[in-house]
């Protein structure tokens, strides 16, 4: 269920302050955050945020297309190694 429009988007306060200061001073440093739950708002566009995926920080450059999404959507937490192969076909090919 989506968030109520009257509440507005959720952004962690400490993250918003860091991004506001970076925009104000023109600082291009990467901002580290554990706040995967924060919504990307238009003020974030042009900033690089390093989002924690549970193991390491993934740098995410924020563009206009990302506005309205959550930061966590751009830092996957799971690694997909593929499904197990068919063992019969390997044996069959050896004939």
Curated annotation (Swiss-Prot):
The keyword Ribosomal protein is assigned to this record: yes
Alphabetized Gene3D superfamilies for the sequence: 30s Ribosomal Protein S19, Chain A
Keyword rRNA-binding: yes
GO biological process, one term: ribosomal small subunit assembly
Gene Ontology MF annotations: rRNA binding; structural constituent of ribosome
Family annotation (InterPro entries): Ribosomal_uS19, Ribosomal_uS19_bac-type, Ribosomal_uS19_CS, Ribosomal_uS19_SF
Keywords carried by this UniProt record: Ribonucleoprotein, Ribosomal protein, RNA-binding, rRNA-binding
GO cellular component, one term: small ribosomal subunit
Family: Belongs to the universal ribosomal protein uS19 family.
PANTHER family assigned to the protein according to its UniProt record, in alphabetical order: RIBOSOMAL PROTEIN S19P FAMILY MEMBER (PTHR11880), SMALL RIBOSOMAL SUBUNIT PROTEIN US19M (PTHR11880:SF8)
Annotated function: Protein S19 forms a complex with S13 that binds strongly to the 16S ribosomal RNA.
UniProt-recorded name of the protein: Small ribosomal subunit protein uS19
Organism: Syntrophobacter fumaroxidans (strain DSM 10017 / MPOB)
Gene coding for it: rpsS
């Amino acid at each position: 269920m989506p968030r109520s429009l009257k509440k507005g988007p959720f952004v962690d306060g400490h993250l918003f302050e860091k991004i506001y200061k970076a925009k104000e001073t023109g600082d291009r440093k990467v901002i580290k955050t554990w706040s995967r739950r924060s919504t990307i708002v238009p003020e974030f566009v042009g900033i690089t945020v390093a989002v924690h995926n549970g193991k390491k920080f993934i740098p995410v450059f924020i563009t206009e297309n990302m506005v309205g999404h959550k930061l966590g959507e751009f830092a996957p937490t799971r690694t997909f190694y593929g499904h197990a192969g068919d063992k019969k076909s390997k044996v069959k090919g050896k004939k």
